[in-house]
């Protein structure tokens, strides 16, 4: 059982080069990024060290749209309670950007609140195979959403950290939620590669750059999301990994 728990946590981390956080870190940290867009960071412990996972939520006239979920089900209620306390609105939509627990782990909880839950068909097939809770609604790789007056776009750039991850683009704010395909600026390596497609990863990042050339903020999936060198640093890490692999062969 312990081996399974540790393996699941490694999957969720998506990287081994994360920096540790002190014990004073809150269960859920919320920071305003733009007018109605907030970054939330949650923490989990692996081998006695605390790590961070980042995602966002959008406050609309209709309610709150949550991208991904807090990392650990014990944080779900506190998170949604805090949203209601801050904004006086309920969560009406949840979108999982890939199948790992720090992204799709809240699908069942958000559904229980009456929120509509979404994932790509690819993510849904992985969740079904793993016998995990699935989204109510699925879509092909790319989809545009409009909630009230707010619009955002889900885009599949190709394989990288996993086969199924997508990014989310908020055009009004020029914010890209990169998730785990984008490594933070201080990541030391590509991390967990058990489900990765390293040879496809560079092209997938280039696809993101081509699709969204005017990014003002990029939110990496883990660690320091405020470091805006994340996209280039991801490309550098991929190149370093490939060079090491080539040298060892």
Curated annotation (Swiss-Prot):
Residues 1-22 form the signal peptide. GO terms for cellular component: periplasmic space. Zn(2+) 1 binds at residues 98, 100, 161. Zn(2+) 2 binds at residues 102, 180, 222. It is found in: Periplasm. Binds 2 Zn(2+) ions per subunit. Its main location: periplasm. Its cofactor is Zn(2+). Substrate binds at residue 183. It catalyses: a beta-lactam + H2O = a substituted beta-amino acid. Pfam families: Lactamase_B (PF00753). Keywords: Antibiotic resistance, Hydrolase, Metal-binding, Periplasm, Signal, Zinc. GO terms for molecular function: beta-lactamase activity; zinc ion binding. GO terms for biological process: antibiotic catabolic process; response to antibiotic. Its EC number is 3.5.2.6. Confers resistance to the different beta-lactams antibiotics (penicillin, cephalosporin and carbapenem) via the hydrolysis of the beta-lactam ring. Monomer. Belongs to the metallo-beta-lactamase superfamily. Class-B beta-lactamase family. This is Metallo-beta-lactamase type 2.
